[in-house]
Amino acid sequence: MQRKPGSGGRQKRISGSGSVFRRGGGLGTGPVGSGGGFGGSSGSSGDRDGRGGGSMGLIALLIAYLLGRGGSGGNGKRKGGCLSRIILLLVILALGYMVVQCVAGDMDGTGGYDGSSDIQLIEAEPTPTPKPQLAQTQAVAADTTVSNLAREKRTQIRGGGQDVYTIMVYMCGTDLESNYGMATSDINEMLHADLSDKVNIIVETGGADKWQNTVISSKVNQIYQVKNEGILRLEADFGKKAMTKAETLTEFIQYCESNFPADRYALIMWDHGGGSNTGYGYDQKFPNGSMTLDVFNKALKDAGCTFDFIGFDACLMATLETAMVAEQYSDYFIASEETEPGCGWYYTNWLTQLSRNTSMDTVSIGKTIIDDYTAACRQQSSSNQTTLSLIDLAELSGTVPEAFNKFASSTVELIDSDSYTVVSNARSRAKEFSSGINQIDLINFADNMGTPEAKALSEALRGCIKYNRVSRSLANANGISIYFPYRKLSSMNSMVDIYDEIGMDDAYTNCIRSFASVAAGGQLTSSSSGSPLTSLFGDMSGSGNSADMLSELLSAALSGSGSYSSGSSYSSGGSSYSDLFDMFAGMRSVKNKKARWLDRDAMTAAEDFYANNRLDASRLIATHKDGKKVLKLTDAEWDLVQDTALNVFIDDGEGYIDLGIDNTYEFDDDLDLILDYDKTWIALNGQVVHYELMSNDVDGDSYVITGRVPALLNGERVDLILVFTDEDPYGTVAGARIVYGDETDTVMKGLIDIKPGDTLNFLCDYYSYDGEYLDSYM
C-alpha cells in the first residue's frame, strides 16, 4: 500500500464527548455490521490489568481468529474498556483480512464510553427535491463513430421523422411507489412531455402494495398508455402476476408489439436492481426472488422482439453480463454502474425531443437521457452520486468477445504462474460498486492489469461506450462493470450457474474460479501460521511457514480428513477450520464440498506461492518509539498490504460493543504505522454510532468517502448513508437506505429523507469475550 507521513483516510473533527451503551433487549435481527466480529484464536492473549480494560496490543492473521478474554477482576466481572484493531488487507489473502488489534490508552467505564469521540456533528435535514421542466444538458460530445467490426443494427430507422416508436415501460412499483410515490412521479414526467401520435408509451404496472395515486390498482397488474390528455387504461386486469417472472415480461412485450406495431421499440425496466448476480426487480406482492439474468434472457428470447435500446431505470445493471444478454435482442443499452438516486431517469425532455423527430438517432436519445438524469439528480441533491452510460451493443458484439476471451485466458495464466499478486493488486485497486456484491469497473480493472490483452480489452470496451456521465469525484467509473470475486465468495455458485445459462465465455468462468480458489487456499493456509495473537509480545512458537506444512494442511482440508495438527489450528473436529469458513462469508460450502466452482488443483498448485507470499506473523511486533506504539515493516512487507482500516470494540463489562470500521489511521515520519488509538469515533448529533466504511473514491485532490450507520427509522431497518468529500470533509447524512434482509438482494433506488418528527434509533452488534456474536441492540 502507499504510505506517507500523517493521517490517512477521512479527516477528523473532535467536537465533544459521548457514551456508548446498550439499551433494552436484543433485537434478534442478526448482525447489522460487517458480520465478522473480531474473530477467534487459540493461544494466550497476553496480560490485562485487574480492571479488564487496560492497554495491550493484539494481532491476528485472519478476521476469523478469536481474541482471548484477557484478565478479569477478582469477582469475575470486567469493567469497560476499549479494544481497537487496525485491519491490513493482504495481497495473498485477497479475500480476507490481516488484522492488527491494539488497545491504546485507557478507555475505562462501567458499561459506557467516557473518552472523547471523533464527533461529526452531521445534521440530518430534509432535502427539497424539485423537478426541472427541462433539465439543462452538458455540451459534451457523444461518440458517434462505429467500428467496422460491428454487426448490422437490427433496427433500421426510416428517417425524415416518419418512424413510429413504441416504448415499453415495465414498471414494478414495489416500495419505491408504495412508500415514496417514485413511479407516480415518473409517470407524471412522461405526462408533461409534448407527445407525438407516432410515439406510443405503454406501461405495465404491478409489484406495489399501494400506488400513490387514485388511478392505478395495487390488486392486479394493469396496462396503461401515456398520452397528452392523460393516461389511458388499456387493461384493467392483466392478471395478478409476479413481475420478476419471465412469462410476465414476455407477455407484456408481446402485447405491446401486437397492439402497437412500430419501426422502433424500446424496453425500459423500472424498479430496484442488484447487478449481475441478483438481477432486476423486487415485487412486493411476490417478494421471494428477483429476475436474474438467465430469467431475463428467457423472457426476451420467448418474446421474439428486437429493440432499438433496452434501458434499466434501476441500480447497478450496467454490467458486461447484462449487456451480453441484451445484445442478442437490442442495438443499444442504457444503464447505471452504481446505485441510482431516487429521482431516477428524467422522462419529460427526451420524450419531447423524440416526439419532435421520431427518426432521432439512438445515440442522441441516449445522450439526452443521460444528461437529463445527471442534471435532475444533481438538482435534487448535490450529494447524489450518479453514473449512466450508453453502450453500442452491435459494436460490442463485433469487438469485445475475442478481446475478452484473450484477457480472461491471459489472466488465468498469470494466476497459474505464481503471478496471482498482479491480478489481486489490480482487483483491489479497481473501482467497486455498491457494497459486497463483487462488482467492479471492467475498464479500470483492465487498465490496472496493464497486460497487452488487458489493454486491448480496455480499448474495445471504450469504443463500445458511446456516452458516459458520472458525478464529480466518482473516479474510475467508465461505463461498464463485471462480477469479479474478492472478499466474499457466497455468490460464486449462483454466478457460475448464471454464466452457464447466459453463455458467458468459459475462459472468464475459469478465470474467476481460479482466482477465487487460490484466494480460498490463501485463507486456509493462513490459519496454519500459529497463533499470531502473541506476536506483539515476542512469544511465537514456530513460524509455520514451511511448504511441507502448507501442503499437509491443504491436503487434509480438501480431503476432509482433518489430519493436520503440527502446531496449526486445523483438526478433524474442525472448530478453527469451521470457524474460518463460517467467518469467510459463504466458504463453509468449500468444506462441505458444495462449492462447485472450487478448483482444487489451482489451490494445491499454489503451495509455493502461499509459502513465498505470506507476511510472517512473527514480524508483526509492536515497537515503542517516541512514546508511541508503531508497526515497523520493510517496504517489501508493506507491498503485501492492500489497505488499512480501524475497527473498534467497547468493553462494557459483559462483552464487546462493535463500533464498526473506519478508514482513519496514521503513519509517522519514518512511514511506520502508529498503533495507538486516540479514543475517538464518529457520532451523529453527539451520539456515538456504529459506522461501516463502504467506499473511498479518490481522484487527485478530490475524494468521496461513503459509509453507513445501521439504524431503525420509524421502526424500519435502514442504513444511514454518510458522505465525506474534499469540499465537505466533516460529512453529511445523504439519507437513509432500506435494508430488505432476506426479502431481496436488490439494492434500493435512491435514499429516504430524514424529516423532523421521525424516530431514529441507532443499532450496534454485541459480542461475547470469546468473539461470539450474541445479538444486536439499540
Regions found by a protein language model. Name each.
Residues 2-3, 20, 82-89, 100-261:
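N-terminal extension/subdomain marker
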Residues 166-171, 200-205, 265-269, 308-312, ...:
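Structural recognition of the beta-strand scaffold that forms the well-ordered cores
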Residues 1-35, 56, 181-184, 247-250, ...:
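Conserved structured core elements
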Residues 100, 104-128, 133-135, 139-160, ...:
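Terminal, contiguous helix-loop blocks that mediate binding/assembly
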Residues 206-305, 314-315, 320, 337-338:
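Catalytic-core segments of thiol-dependent peptidases
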Residues 1-125, 533-569, 576-577:
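Long amphipathic alpha-helical segments used for membrane anchoring, targeting, substrate engagement
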Residues 171-174, 207, 271-273, 486-488:
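Residue-level signal for short, function-critical loop segments
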